[in-house]
């Protein structure tokens, strides 16, 4: 084995370009507008650190996203609180070339379980959405997907490493979803989708806990 068990790993199952474009383990967001889609993990930028009390803040320089007939200027801030198992990620829409336009923001996490380049058996993983209704998927590599508008949490439990990973969102109107992988792309996906407009801020939290 090459590392401790991981869900997202920099060397193995690594990022956007691993195996299948967009199917490596990654925590990112996609912006969609009129059939076009751009992933923020493909937008290089710089960042700087600051600290407020016990919270360290990573502020990324704004990136400009160009669609055919719309330009969006977006800034990301990430918050790491000492002693916490939660990471807060904020997306700020700073400017739009058309202030009345609306884009779809898809905050997502793609992950799998393993210690090497190849994932372990994920058959015991359980995906779940909590909210106005509860939906679950018992992992069977069938490429299934479920979604709930107004979801309070989307989560995955990995019994082999006694881990529960989840995402929550700042807007109760956002749609939470979970996606199951398949044999040649076994990773699972947790995410939230929301329509967002000029000057709006949308926050999500990536949460890690011990599963009993």
Residue ranges and their predicted role:
Residues 1, 19, 116, 142-147:
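Short linear motifs in intrinsically disordered
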Residues 1-107, 111:
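Catalytic and substrate-binding regions of extracellular carbohydrate-active enzymes
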Residues 17, 24-26, 37, 55, ...:
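Compositionally biased, intrinsically disordered low-complexity regions
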Residues 46-57, 79-85, 122, 129-132, ...:
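Short, ordered beta-strand-loop transition motifs
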Residues 99-104, 108-110, 129-130, 137-212:
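Beta-strand-rich recognition/accessory modules
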Residues 112-124:
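Short aromatic-acidic-glycine turn motif
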């Amino acid at each position: 084995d090459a590392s401790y068990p991981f869900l997202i790993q920099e060397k193995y199952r690594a990022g956007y370009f691993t195996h299948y474009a967009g199917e490596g383990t990654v925590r990112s967001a996609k912006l969609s507008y009129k059939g076009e889609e751009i992933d923020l993990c493909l937008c290089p930028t710089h960042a700087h650190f600051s600290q407020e009390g016990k919270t360290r803040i990573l502020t990324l320089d704004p990136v400009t996203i160009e669609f055919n007939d719309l330009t969006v200027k977006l800034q990301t801030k990430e918050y790491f609180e000492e002693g916490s198992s939660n990471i807060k990620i904020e997306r700020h829409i700073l400017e739009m070339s058309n202030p009345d336009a609306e884009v779809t923001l898809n905050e997502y996490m793609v992950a799998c379980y393993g210690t090497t380049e190849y994932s372990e058996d994920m058959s015991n993983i359980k995906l779940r959405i909590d909210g106005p209704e509860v939906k679950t998927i018992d992992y069977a590599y069938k490429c299934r997907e479920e979604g709930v508008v107004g979801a309070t949490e989307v989560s995955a439990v990995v019994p082999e490493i006694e881990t529960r990973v989840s995402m929550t969102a700042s807007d109760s109107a956002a749609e939470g979803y979970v996606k199951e992988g398949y044999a040649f792309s076994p990773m699972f996906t947790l995410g939230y989708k929301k329509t967002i407009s000029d000057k709006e801020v949308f926050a999500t939290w990536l949460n890690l806990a011990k599963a009993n």
